[in-house]
């Protein structure tokens, strides 16, 4: 049975290795390390199976160009599952859990730059349809979900991820 919990310092090496294996390069692993070091890992959860870290999800703060000062938004990135455990529902469990953590912790919305066949099943819709743009010129695969009903009516403009994303050219 999968257990999902907040990351702990003893998980950091496994999370680093997991991201390298899942993405095939060290960029996302470096991003996680940099976000954590800058205290920008707002939500960072791990999936544990038989005592082993098999999945990880991280949410970091975002800003929206034209939004109320009180807006608390998150960017979902990265989310990874060890290759040998993919397509078993672990990623879906991490996303559902992470969104619920965001709601419980008072966040307003989450954006993701991700797979069109994966994220809509959780309620993500095309961000452009809500007047939101991104720094990466992504269109259809840049998506958003409200964690508080009606919040998207008050926001438009450019969504900016944490500076660490630009520093690593993710």
Give a label for each model feature.
Residues 1-31, 38-54, 75, 149-170:
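Short amphipathic alpha-helix that is part of the acyltransferase structural core
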Residues 99-114:
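Conserved GNAT acetyl-CoA-binding A-motif
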């Amino acid at each position: 049975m999968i257990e999902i919990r907040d990351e702990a310092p003893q998980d950091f090496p496994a999370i680093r290795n997991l991201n390298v294996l899942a993405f095939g390069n060290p960029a996302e692993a470096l991003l996680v390390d940099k976000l954590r070091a800058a205290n920008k890992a707002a939500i960072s959860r791990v999936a544990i199976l038989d005592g082993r870290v098999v999945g990880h999800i991280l949410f970091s703060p975002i800003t929206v160009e034209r939004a109320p000062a009180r807006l608390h938004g998150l960017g979902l990135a990265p989310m990874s599952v060890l290759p040998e455990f993919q397509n078993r529902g672990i990623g879906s469990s991490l996303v559902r859990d992470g969104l619920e953590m965001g709601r419980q912790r008072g966040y307003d919305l989450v954006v993701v730059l991700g797979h069109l066949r994966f994220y809509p099943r959780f309620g993500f819709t095309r961000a452009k349809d809500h007047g939101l743009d991104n720094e990466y010129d992504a269109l259809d695969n840049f998506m958003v979900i409200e964690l508080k009903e009606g919040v998207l009516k008050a926001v438009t403009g450019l969504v900016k991820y944490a500076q660490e994303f630009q520093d690593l050219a993710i």
